[in-house]
Swiss-Prot record:
Protein name: Uncharacterized protein in nthA 5'region
One Pfam family, short name: Amidase
Signal peptide range: none
UniProt cross-references to InterPro entries, sorted A to Z: Amidase, Amidase_dom, AS_sf
Coiled-coil regions listed: none
A single GO molecular function term of this UniProt record: catalytic activity
Amino acid sequence: HAFHIWNVIATDGGAYQMLDGNGYGMNAEGLYDPELMAHFASRRIQHADALSETVKLVALTGHHGITTLGGASYGKARNLVPLARAAYDTALRQFDVLVMPTLPYVASELPAKDVDRATFITKALGMIANTAPFDVTGHPSLSVPAGLVNGVPVGMMITGRHFDDATVLRVGRAFEKLRGAFPTPAERASNSAPQLSPA
């Protein structure tokens, strides 16, 4: 369910950041760039039609959630984050790291420029189902090239315990050493790179 939690946080939070914060969240430490914020605001207002379909969806859905529900969905999603974090923490008490495909499917060709809006958005957001939960829980994660499936590169995501980024990096490095260098385009063309079995 962590992906669904992320979905609400990303849409409501993303809409607020894009529409009200002009590219910035509020109450964050660090420097702000007022010129950039003003530029972002003017360009967003003048050229909203140039935004990608995915950005438009996030902006409209999030704005709707904030204005009609007063941010309650965002608050509920934020309140569920500790449960998602605890579920992964439980698994990580049994294992040093969790390993999964970076994408939930083998990458496909980019959609054509004239593809319908629903297909474009589905393809864009479908890729992040395995990575987005850790954007919410804050677990350190790393994607490393894992090989090829039917000639298409695939990634392996390694996720570890909070504040144990070093283990995630060590496991990633060990896998890279064991697997060998990722094939160059010439190697891929000659089909000399090791192939993985599709899952």
